[in-house]
Amino acid sequence: MAPAKEIWAVGRRKTSVARAKIKEGSGKITVNHKDIKDYLQNRKAIIEEAVRPLSLLNVLDKYDLNLNVSGGGITGQVGAIRHALARAICRIKPEFRPAVKKEGFLTRDPRMVERKKYGLHKARRGTQFSKR
């Protein structure tokens, strides 16, 4: 039997970057060499959000996923994982692309933290105005 082909894809969100390796298998998901439940601290809603592209297509138990995530916090990393999985599944089976695109999983979320400006407390917060 020929070895299962592996597909790599990269996803990004805020300052997080996720690299996903996807191949046919039994549905095993590892993130940074840990099980996804351990890595995302067994938070069900966050785990479901991360694998939504696969659950949308009902292929969650048909592929093994190996993810490497760096940068940012939990929300950014989950968004990056979701983006990487959506890109990877579309590379494996191009017929999935319209459904994934319709849900907006292929779109890179451009929102980033606005930088702090000098003369202000934060990005937009200035000093309090005093009339007298």
UniProtKB/Swiss-Prot annotation:
BP GO annotations: translation
User: What are the protein's UniProt keywords?
Assistant: Ribonucleoprotein, Ribosomal protein
Q: Name one GO molecular function term.
A: RNA binding
Name the Pfam families on file.
Ribosomal_S9 (PF00380)
Q: Which GO terms describe its cellular component?
A: cytosolic small ribosomal subunit
Ribosomal protein found in the keyword field: yes
Q: Which InterPro entries match?
A: Ribosomal_Su5_D2-typ_SF, Ribosomal_uS9, Ribosomal_uS9_bac/plastid, Ribosomal_uS9_CS, Ribsml_uS5_D2-typ_fold_subgr
Q: Does the keyword Ribosomal protein apply?
A: yes
Q: Which SUPFAM superfamilies match?
A: Ribosomal protein S5 domain 2-like
Task: Name the family the entry cites.
Answer: Belongs to the universal ribosomal protein uS9 family.
Instruction: List the PANTHER family.
Output: RIBOSOMAL PROTEIN S9 (PTHR21569), SMALL RIBOSOMAL SUBUNIT PROTEIN US9M (PTHR21569:SF1)
* Name this protein carries in UniProt: Small ribosomal subunit protein uS9
